[in-house]
């Protein structure tokens, strides 16, 4: 982003991502990293009225201006006035304006995105365009995506759109300083890929001790954050998330649980990245989809904490953590399976698996229920079949036999596909062959 801000050309950048993903940290780092030849302003919007927001913006802007420009600064009548003033000052000195939580301005100022569009359409085409960089950042990702859509005010206006997502397990491993791999998976299963959550996890303590402190104590970060998130979502999005997290995976099941129409609110949940729609890899485009909570932390909270918040706040956190141990192990298993798929994608990138192989999960939709954690398709044929197990004992030949059984069901397998086992305790060497690969947590997180 520093490169974007120092081109000398007008730039309109949109940065979106969920709360706690690190947007504000990144933006403040950008402000600090800008060289002395550029004036930089960081403004964090809030839920105040437009007049109050404009006054605060002027107060933040003034110290960044040259004395001559600061002397011209008057109270802004509206946001078009404010942005036009910024464009005028950027003609003599490059100016970076960062507006964080911009969706609050969209709520307090009717047509705020259209105002940005008007100012941008006026200055961007000019041969002597001002060196103004505007960065709009926000956590209400569905609202931002609406603004960027075909019918939105900023359709095709930004010079760059950056969508921040939570860390993958491998990225979290690097961020946390490469702790013991098994401990990382435990932290990730509870914290998800959010830097603030991971920073709070103490790798010098056991998983249970961390869970008691962060999730099983009144006011614990992992207990409270999801409550805040769900409270901020419009109804019925929060009820949709709870229904999906509690196992309602089909549209009809979700509708019955929520008791209202799903089209728009479910679409918003998908666009925020909290929910994903999945189907077996290789299935027809019109195949019925299932819905799943895509956010690891939110899935942890709904799966383990949602039904017990009052008990934890009443001081029964230790009992709750003990009572939900089975669900905790299921959460670890699903996180480990997703990490195996991400690792397989890395193996394709590095050339260990055939170039062009598509990786995802697969299951039968009728007849005998068969689930394959990792299936790789190349030209519509199954070339990779894998299974991931969160168990202490190293995986062996009996686990490999399960892959051979799955071979009878997967789509059009080649004669000698590559089998892969991923195990929490690794894979026994006598189980591996030239066509059966085995990996443990350390190898999975190295990608």
What would you call each of these model-derived segments?
Residues 415-447:
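Domain-level recognition of nuclease-like catalytic cores that cleave nucleotide substrates
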Residues 201-371:
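Accessory nucleic acid-recognition modules appended to NTPase machines
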Residues 13-16, 104-151:
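Sensor-1/coupling segment of RecA-like P-loop NTPase cores
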Residues 159-184:
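Conserved small helical "lid"/interfacial subdomain of P-loop NTPases
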Residues 18-40:
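P-loop NTPase Walker A phosphate-binding motif
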Residues 68-98, 104-108, 119-130:
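Mid-core helix/loop region of P-loop NTP-binding domains shared across ATPases and GTPases
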Residues 40-41, 46-70, 300:
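Conserved NTP-binding/hydrolysis module of P-loop NTPases
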């Amino acid at each position: 982003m520093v490169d974007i801000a120092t081109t000398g050309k007008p730039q309109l950048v949109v940065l979106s991502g969920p709360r706690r993903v690190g947007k504000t940290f990144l933006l403040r780092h950008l402000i600090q990293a800008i060289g002395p030849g550029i004036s930089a302003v960081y403004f964090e919007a809030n839920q105040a009225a437009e007049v109050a927001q404009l006054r605060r913006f002027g107060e933040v802007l003034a110290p960044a201006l040259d004395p001559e420009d600061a002397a011209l600064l008057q109270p802004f009548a509206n946001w078009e006035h404010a942005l036009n003033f910024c464009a005028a000052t950027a003609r003599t000195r490059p100016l970076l304006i960062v507006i964080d939580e911009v969706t609050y301005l969209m709520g307090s100022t009717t047509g705020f995105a259209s105002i940005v569009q008007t100012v941008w359409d006026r200055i961007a085409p000019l041969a002597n365009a001002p060196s103004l960089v505007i960065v709009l950042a926000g956590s209400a990702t569905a609202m931002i995506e609406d603004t960027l859509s075909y019918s939105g005010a900023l359709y095709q206006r930004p010079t760059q759109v950056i969508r921040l997502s939570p860390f993958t397990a491998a990225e979290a491993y690097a961020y946390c300083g490469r702790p013991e791999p098994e401990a990382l998976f435990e932290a990730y299963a509870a914290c998800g890929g959010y830097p603030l959550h991971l920073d709070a996890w103490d790798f010098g303590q056991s998983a249970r001790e961390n869970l008691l402190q962060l999730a099983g104590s009144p006011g614990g970060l992992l207990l409270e954050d999801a409550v805040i998130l769900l409270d901020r979502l419009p109804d019925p999005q929060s009820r949709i998330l709870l229904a999906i997290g509690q196992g309602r995976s089909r549209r009809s099941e979700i509708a019955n649980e929520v008791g209202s129409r799903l089209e728009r609110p479910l679409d918003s949940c998908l666009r925020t990245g909290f929910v994903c729609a999945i189907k077996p890899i290789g299935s027809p485009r019109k195949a019925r989809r299932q819905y799943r909570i895509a956010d690891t932390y939110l899935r942890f909270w709904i799966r383990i904490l949602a039904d017990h918040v009052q008990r934890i706040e009443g001081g029964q956190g230790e009992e709750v953590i003990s009572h939900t141990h089975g669900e905790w192990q299921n959460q670890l298993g699903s996180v480990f399976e997703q990490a195996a798929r991400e690792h397989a994608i890395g193996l394709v990138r590095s050339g260990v698996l055939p170039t062009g192989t598509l990786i995802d999960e697969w299951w039968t939709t009728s007849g005998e229920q068969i689930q394959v954690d990792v299936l790789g398709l190349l030209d519509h044929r199954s070339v990779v079949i894998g299974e991931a197990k969160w168990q202490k004992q190293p995986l062996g030949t009996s686990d490999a036999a399960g892959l051979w059984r799955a071979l009878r069901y997967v789509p059009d397998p080649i004669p000698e596909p590559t089998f892969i086992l991923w195990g929490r305790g690794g894979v026994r060497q006598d189980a591996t062959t030239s066509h059966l690969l085995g990996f443990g947590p350390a190898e999975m997180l190295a990608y």
